[in-house]
Amino acid sequence: MFKGLYTVATGMIAQQRKTEIITNNMANANTPGFKADQSTIRSFPDMLLSAVGNTNIPVDKKINAPFIQEIGAVNTGIYLQETLANHAQGSLIETNKTTDIALIDGLFPIDEESGNSGAIFFRLEHPDGGEAYTRNGNFTLDPEGYLVNGNGYYVLSDTGERIIVPNDNFVVSGDGTVSVDDVEVATLGVSFSLNPALLVKQDNGLFQTVDGTNLASAFNQEGVTFGFKQNFLEGSNVDSAKSMTDLLTAYRAFEANQKVLQAYDKSMEKAVNEIGRV
């Protein structure tokens, strides 16, 4: 009975966490460059994997199947294994604002170890040192003329320098070249991650590497193609309809576990009362 309580509890916790992830995605459906989080729920994996290849588990000798093998004891319950960002391209939104710039995904190599496709990001100077990365191209000019993001982080060029322009009358070409009065002043910095699942997602649509090292420039990567579009923003890649469906599914699963928990509670109450009468 207590094992059943544990199973129900883990189910409720996992579904509650999944609900929180989905609602956060929906809340950021209109946030430029936002990458939706995806959760993975696993059940009894540890004991199952440990049993693979274990020849010491007894098998019913009456079964005429020489290659059959039992998996042994199975751990009950589920848990939310991991939460990963979906780095698929969001739709483009025209803003007619010079400082709004969208990154356009092209072709990226596949990481052989993880099977994930690579991803590109704008380079930002983090105030605590190192770099931060974002897909939100909703930039502005600070009082000194530097191109910054909504948090005031400096947008970096491909050479790692801050980008300064005299006013918002500048042009960004399809290859990222920033020009003022037909004079090239910089090239927008873009970094590439072969396995973006290893990046740490921060607040405000920012990403950083786990160890604080800087990602390599996307311009120097073989097989990486991309472009830029000024006066546009990349919208979030949240699928609102799917998110609503997933939210209802998670809620129903939580509700089902809750009813099972109530049934266990009544059974235990009955057992205690009957034992008390003995």
Model-derived regions, located:
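Amphipathic alpha-helical polymerization modules
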Residues: 1-278
